[in-house]
Amino acid sequence: MNGTEGPYFYVPMSNATGVVRSPYEYPQYYLAPPWAYACLAAYMFFLILVGFPVNFLTLYVTIEHKKLRTPLNYILLNLAVADLFMVFGGFTTTMYTSLNGYFVFGRLGCNLEGFFATFGGINSLWCLVVLSIERWVVVCKPMSNFRFGENHAIMGVAFTWFMALACTVPPLVGWSRYIPEGMQCSCGIDYYTRAEGFNNESFVIYMFVVHFLTPLFVITFCYGRLVCTVKEAAAQQQESETTQRAEREVTRMVILMFIAYLVCWLPYASVSWWIFTNQGSEFGPIFMTVPAFFAKSSSIYNPVIYICLNKQFRHCMITTLCCGKNPFEEEEGASTTASKTEASSVSSVSPA
């Protein structure tokens, strides 16, 4: 074996030389130099420094401005809450453990950090699925009389929480487990071992199919149909400048959404699956650490792409930050008016 398996941990280094120690008790500087751990801590500090204000501001601005309290924005608020789960439950812990070079909070701390970080990530992932379904239903109108209302939004939020709990609770009760991963400073699902009594194999397959491939398929289908619908609407109104502008805007948003999804989750899912299907193969701690931290960065991508590019929200945010006045009032007002015109031209295809 090219790694060292112990009680509730797996260190990606052979213990032939006798240097491997428990990641709950000793610094892991034999895996990477201290400066590498310092870089991880600095990166987590950056995510906290950016992720907390942006997501908190999203919550505050939406609550402060009544016109933003729409059913669709319930999902966007839930997205911000999911990102804050990652910031407080995962990033703060990982920053502190990286500064120490090992997981100082022990087994209980590993369970809590793994749960909160995974819960936030999976919850936000299913929020994106609900958003894509909402956009598909509203724009493509597969059900002609359907109107997305408050009850639908509440059901959507409840669905994201149910799916997140369905992924994060089982490792706490014996179906798989949370263990330190990569450089042993953060915890995640055990993709590394086939430890007796935990049924890791079945859980990893379940997680990969239900919580990665399924969201990927749904998002691809919904946004693919959205692009086709916008193109059809533009083709019928070729002389309408606002329609053409709406097509470009929605297409850009779709591309950004899809790229962000892939950047955040494809590397992590791919590496996890490779490790799972090639157990016993040699790999270094950085091999798992880098994609895991790509996934954590979704707490920044989400509010920027899904909220800050929304003209109406941006106007309200600037007004809030500038104590009730928007110094770009004329420009923002014109953009908002144009956005409304575009929305009416192509059946409300604007991002939100």
From Swiss-Prot:
Comp. bias intervals (Low complexity): 334-352
Predominant cellular place of this UniProt entry's protein: membrane
Gene Ontology CC terms, in alphabetical order: membrane; photoreceptor disc membrane; plasma membrane
PTM annotation: Phosphorylated on some or all of the serine and threonine residues present in the C-terminal region.
Topological type in the membrane: Multi-pass membrane protein
Transmembrane intervals: 37-61, 74-96, 111-133, 153-173, 203-224, 253-274, 287-308
Family indicated by similarity: Belongs to the G-protein coupled receptor 1 family. Opsin subfamily.
Protein name: Rhodopsin
Gene that encodes it: rho
